[in-house]
Amino acid sequence: MSGTTEQQVSAQTPDWSRERIGKFWDPGQKLMRALRRYQAARARGGVLGKAASKYWALNHLFWSTICQSEIHLNTQIGGGLRLTHPTGIIIHPDARIGVNCMIFHQVTLAGPVVLGGHVDIGAGAKLLGPLTVGDHAVIGANAVVTRDVPPGATVAGIPARIIKP
């Protein structure tokens, strides 16, 4: 999807350059920046941290509205998350996202979904938890995943079935 192979993208070490804002209008990256800075300010604590967290919460609300996406401020997200076409993405507050994942538009992570490292989720996919997706897995577009996905597998369909182990 991004022109790199599975072996070139780590499932353990975050590639922070994937979250870098590359152009003026990059709403997905700006949404992630607001979320990351909110979490950092919240962790800092104190009066300054509280004021900064309020600013970044408003910034997150602005970019969530622009993207029409719902990503809770306290969701655990590993480094290097790429939101390609970030419209209509809904992520449950109990979901955990591993490093270097890529999520396309209209994706829903419902319930306590755990994504491993370098998981690519195609447009319109629905992951209905509780479930776990292994490292380097690929979820096809419009798939409805209701069961665990093993590492390195490709799943697609409604309901999702393994098409490449």
What are the language-model segments listed below?
Residues 73, 78-79, 84-93, 98-99, ...:
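Left-handed beta-helix
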Residues 160-162:
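Conserved switch/coupling elements of ABC/ABC-like ATPase nucleotide-binding domains
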Residues 1-68:
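Terminal amphipathic alpha-helical/low-complexity segments used for targeting or macromolecular assembly
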